[in-house]
Curated annotation (Swiss-Prot):
Family stated for the protein in its record: Belongs to the PIH1 family.
Protein name: PIH1 domain-containing protein 1
Role according to the record: Involved in the assembly of C/D box small nucleolar ribonucleoprotein (snoRNP) particles. Recruits the SWI/SNF complex to the core promoter of rRNA genes and enhances pre-rRNA transcription. Mediates interaction of TELO2 with the R2TP complex which is necessary for the stability of MTOR and SMG1. Positively regulates the assembly and activity of the mTORC1 complex.
GO cellular component: cytoplasm; nucleus; R2TP complex; ribonucleoprotein complex
Domain of life where this protein originates: Eukaryota
InterPro entries named in the record: PIH1/Kintoun_subfamily, PIH1_N, PIH1D1/2/3_CS-like
Cellular localization per UniProt: Nucleus
Any one of the GO BP annotations: axonemal dynein complex assembly
Keyword Transcription regulation appears in the UniProt entry: yes
Keywords: Nucleus, Transcription, Transcription regulation
Gene name in the database record: pih1d1
């Protein structure tokens, strides 16, 4: 039986239009989030405490300068009882502590040996709370280590030491931070911040570098979203080194840092409804 080519072309055209619509809606969401990006300012954080640890791979010394600033927004209120309950839950990362993670810098320790130092900046009131409560202090150090590991693809030892006689190692660099948090990440009440990620699953994903060898030109994220029938339910936010994805209603939640800086404005997202895979192609910024 002969097949009407015009019918096939019509179906293909309709599918192509639908895919383009999905992509346009997703990119409109990305563009709105980027255009709504709050202003940023350069701050010089105040000293707080200094934590000594080491890199698991080469055993070299690493120091964390946990600093404080009133410019960084505080996390939602959390009592000690709620913190204990949170730490015993399946997903302690559901409670977010806003923080600015600085670039690594090389310093010289008391033994005249070179070491790597990271500056972590948190809200000053929350820092004072952690300073008075050992459990909160341990929690703060844990989330700081995890944040650095995610952002810089590190593995840091949990065998730590808080230095008693110094509040920072080397010098504390200025940092460029947002003056107001993005709604998708920070402006949620304490109840939502504790329930959203536990209800939403972390999707499976892969990160690919193109080309596979040589200088990286593109970073490609492929995120599997089974059960998501349309891009309309996706909220995607790209930062210079971060990807945040929410699939409504509370289906998936992904928040990852990249080991490289990306060009948000020229990034492209496509959602394939057949494979239920979101592909985000991001140009790598040359340093």
């Amino acid at each position: 039986m002969d097949t009407d080519a015009s019918l096939l072309l019509g179906v293909e055209h309709e599918q192509k239009q639908q895919e383009e619509l999905y992509q346009q809606l997703l990119l409109q969401t990305m563009g709105k989030l980027q255009s709504d990006s709050p202003p940023s300012k350069v701050i010089r954080p105040q000293p707080g405490l200094c934590v000594k640890t080491s890199s698991v791979s080469d055993k070299k010394k690493v120091f964390l300068n946990i600093c404080q600033s009133q410019t960084v927004p505080p996390p939602p209120h959390l009592s000690q009882e709620a913190l204990v309950e949170l730490l015993e839950s399946e997903d302690p990362t559901s409670y977010r502590v806003p923080m600015s993670l600085g670039e690594p810098h090389t310093e010289v320790d008391n033994s005249s040996q070179g070491c790597t130092v990271y500056d972590v900046v948190i809200n000053d009131e929350f820092f004072q709370k952690c300073e008075k409560d050992t459990l909160f202090q341990q929690f703060l150090i844990a989330v700081s280590l995890e944040g650095l590991e995610n952002k810089y693809s590190l593995e840091l030892s949990r065998d730590i030491k808080i230095l008693k006689n110094r509040k920072f190692m080397g010098s504390i660099a200025e940092q460029n931070i947002r003056t107001k948090s993005k709604p998708i990440i920070q402006e949620i009440d304490s109840k939502e911040s504790l329930t959203l990620p536990s209800a939403a699953k972390r999707p499976e994903f892969t990160l690919l570098v193109e080309p596979p060898s040589g200088k990286a030109e593109h970073l490609i994220a492929e995120i599997l979203l089974p059960g998501v029938s349309s891009a309309r339910s996706l909220v995607l936010d790209l930062g210079e080194d971060r990807l945040v994805l929410i699939a409504r209603p509370s289906l998936f939640h992904l928040d990852i840092f990249f080991p490289v800086l990306i060009d948000q404005e020229n990034s492209v997202a496509q959602y394939n409804t057949n494979t239920q895979t979101l592909t985000v192609t991001m140009p790598v910024v040359s340093l």
